């Protein structure tokens, strides 16, 4: 909403076409967004500093780092704080549970006590893929480039300094994040808008290497789908695209975005109930819908879900 309001402000008053009362309402909501983002900025700085004093290097993923790419970052709709903590799953899980013993862990992250009302998720892996061999390659990529990410410090407005990933890293990482939303519940507009700004700010020195990585990790077709959406819907110039747009895949993914929304909140196809059985059946139904376009991820999803059940049992407090 905040970004839409920024666009409306650039229009001549005669072209706005909405009432003054609604404009004032949006203005008030934008002011509220600014306050929330300022609070999240402060939380990101303080949580990062807290981990640093405990001996961990960190990197803020998505969120407040992405907001720096926007022309008016304080108007970006914020979420929680995702912080990548160096050290591997066993060390990080052990440390977090020494602070808060009952936090739940999954393959890539563990819950963490909220900081001044702000939700915090601690990542020991930035993201993952459901396909085991593609995920293995993705984790090797993260390990290979992590040094640059943990040392990429930027100023967060006037509030302080944080460490965030490079734009080059985000071209792959945030693509996997959007992919995970597609495979699990649904892609939201915020994820796509974030990626739009990542593309706008990307200064790709070696596009051949980037494309090689996308193919190696199994993201090539999905990247083509997102490039189609970026070009056709968001209007990004063709010169900014990282792979050739794929119209067939792009239209399919765009339809999923429009049908489901973020986390599938608006998906009328979800009719199997909210019970554990209904949720699992819904996942199978989703896999069947996706398998034609993204077979490796869709076919591995039930296997991954079973494997992850035992992983969580093993890593349960």
Residue ranges and their predicted role:
Residues 1-79, 84-317:
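Conserved NTP-donor binding/palm subdomain of two-metal-ion nucleotidyltransferases/polymerases, i.e.
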